[in-house]
Amino acid sequence: YIPIYLIKNNIAKKVIASDINKEPLNKAKINAALDGVSDKIDLRLGGGLYPLKNKEAQAVIIAGMGGNLIRDILENDLDKVRNLDYLILQPAQNPEVLREYLYKNDYEILDEDLCIDENKYYELFKVRYKKGDYISLESIFYEISPFMLNKKLPLLKSYIESKIDKNKKVIEFITDDTEHAIQR
């Protein structure tokens, strides 16, 4: 859906969409045809940035996977990453792992945002590779972004509250003295 949106809203003239599995690409092909944009979307099978040639794109969107996998994709194709104007990253889990990697590995954070979909929060990053931009933060700031704190995002308070609730549940689980917990 993202490639179709980019074309239909004149954000991009041409889009390369890739996936490691054939089925999502087949669905994308059908959706692109239904929306009349098949000629502007190049569908490619492959994982990570592998299907992309070096210097072929200005920007890349990596979304719908965990922060660990996004980090690995960036690390595995650093030559391609260095030649991009920017990347949009949306980890489905572990955004703190990705944030720490970005800060410690020469990425400039251009923007960060939050969204919520079906009661699940998602963090979004707009970044670019910039040699010499190594920054180390206190560990709490990998969990809660200083960028988002400074922007005072509307969803930030409820996002932090949800993280606190989740951590309280983990603490309750590991300190539970029920018979079942004792057996664990």
Please describe what each predicted stretch is.
Residues 1-12:
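Conserved SAM-binding loop of SAM-dependent methyltransferases across substrates and taxa
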Residues 18-58:
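S-adenosyl-L-methionine
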Residues 62-63:
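A short beta-strand submotif of the Rossmann-like class I SAM-dependent methyltransferase core
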Residues 13-14, 40, 86:
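Residues at the starts of beta-strands that form the adenosine-phosphate
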Residues 16-18, 44, 88, 125:
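Hydrophobic/aromatic beta-strand patches that form the interior of the parallel beta-sheet core
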Residues 10-11, 33-38, 79-82:
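Short helix-capping segments at alpha-helix termini
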